[in-house]
Amino acid sequence: MEEAEKASQPHAGTALAFDFGEKRIGVAIGNLELGLAHPLVTLSNKNKEECLKSIARLMDEWKPVLLVVGLPVHADGTEHELTRRSRRFAHRLQARFGIRTVLEDERYTSISASSALDEASVRGRRQKQVLDQIAAQLILQSYFDQRNATT
């Protein structure tokens, strides 16, 4: 994170993170001062308008000062179609809600989330229900860790 970008980030308040997917969007919440992220909810993304209404309810309830959207890229850092869709999603969030929105590299978060859930004996249907919000938690925690490492 560049110094100018770091200076423009809020330092207090609530952050919401999103693991964007075609079918589901995982959401996590965290406190900027504490630098701790927690899974929150998984939203269905089958009906885009209903999904945006659900996100609007989360905005009203949690009053975030920052949004973090996972940016999926190939292992070598090259972009693909879901990268572009995630960027569009982030731009829509910022335009619709007027809240600073940043992108965070999400390489391997779903794999890490699945491994953590396997270790906790969460498998099958239950894992599918929470996998995306755990991935969002890892995205947000990565953002916090990187931010704190540069301060």
Curated annotation (Swiss-Prot):
Keywords: Cytoplasm, Hydrolase, Nuclease, Ribosome biogenesis. It comes from the Bacteria. CDD domains: YqgF (cd16964). Its EC number is 3.1.-.-. InterPro entries: RNaseH-like_sf, YqgF, YqgF/RNaseH-like_dom, YqgF/RNaseH-like_dom_sf. One of its GO terms (cellular component) is cytosol. Its main location: cytoplasm. GO terms for molecular function: nuclease activity. The keyword Cytoplasm applies. The keyword Transmembrane does not apply. It is found in: Cytoplasm. GO terms for biological process: rRNA 5'-end processing. Could be a nuclease involved in processing of the 5'-end of pre-16S rRNA. Belongs to the YqgF nuclease family. This is Putative pre-16S rRNA nuclease.
